[in-house]
Amino acid sequence: VFNRLVLATVGALLLAPTSVLYWQPASQTAAVQGDADDPAIWINPINPEKSLIIGTDKTGNALYVFDLKGKIVQKIGGILRPNNVDVEYGLPLAGRTTDIVVATERNARRLRIFAIDSTSLRLRDITDPKGATVFAGQEGDSAAPMGIALYRRPKDGAIYAVVSRKAGPSGAYLWQYRLVPTAGGRVRLQKVREFGQFSGDGEIEAVAVDDQLGYVYYADENYGILKYHADPEHPEASKLLAVFGKEGFEGEREGIAVYPMRGDKGYLLCVDQRPQRSVVYVFRREGTSANRHDHQQPVAVIHTGSDGTDGIEATSHPLGKQFPSGLLIMMNSRARNFHLYRWQPLPQN
């Protein structure tokens, strides 16, 4: 009897109940003209309250820049179906380091790269038009970029883009590129690897990278969340490290984000895309004490007020009184905009 009680107690601790939470947005951005899809955030190092939200308008062929009040501060048109977007810090360019925004330009089969001016808070196109093509040699949907996540390698500051596409094979769905500055102050791409298993059901769009811990996560939308090393030169770069998030989802697995905390602590977030009330599944960033790649048990399930969410982004950086513990940004389909959620402490199960 004693052994059975011990085993039952251990099992209960290992499978602690998942918290069910209900969040409402603190604010929202202005609407885009066409169809909002994916957000990113740039943290202003001088004044975090003047940080920027960047969002794609895929049918409006534009990239929007918002302040934290949701006001449009810049619109960049002429981008042929921008699907997803990400931000990275510290690209060496023309003798200085530059923070960048990179978006997939699906109908042009390339990436669009922008420098962020930290003084004017405006974006400037620095794409090398002859060197930004992705999925070269592929055809149709296999050449159409969708998701993107940027990775800055800690040991040398090299910046990479991990890119997903509309369709792809079972074993190399994602391609990874190094961002290489040119003598003329532009940025071109250098392909470094193909990787990423795919179930064959649906597609892979959402990708996220944990810069600090060096992992890339992506959503195989009707199957689960997969994890690899982000460094293409890692000895186990081709090894699938984890598959999780296979249970409980009612809709497609869409946006993915990382909410980092001290050390290796924090959360991995993935959207369960639902009409009117998309849900966010929250997993432990650090895994378990026995296995850092074990993310099977969700910490929380957050019910939100966002409709049919595709892309999400999160930050734990304090952003002033409105967002003292950071925020969660979620695409909101019905209103063609992005919801801003004040991050709230999660119960410690």
Regions found by a protein language model. Give the residues of each.
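Short loop/turn segments immediately following beta-strands, especially the blade-tip
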Residues: 44-46, 91-92, 113-125, 176-187, ...
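Loop/turn-rich, solvent-exposed surfaces of beta-rich toroidal or solenoidal domains
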Residues: 248-297
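Conserved blade-ending motifs and adjacent loop-strand segments that build the rim/top face
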Residues: 83, 242-255, 290-319
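Blade-loop segments of beta-propeller domains
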Residues: 68-109
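Surface loop/turn motifs at the tips and blade-to-blade linkers of beta-strand repeat domains
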Residues: 29-33, 76-79, 135-141, 195-200, ...
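Asp-box/WD-like beta-propeller blade repeats and closely related beta-sheet repeat scaffolds
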Residues: 110, 115-159, 164-165
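Structural signature of eukaryotic scaffold interfaces centered on beta-propeller domains
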Residues: 35-49, 84-97, 142-157, 202-214, ...
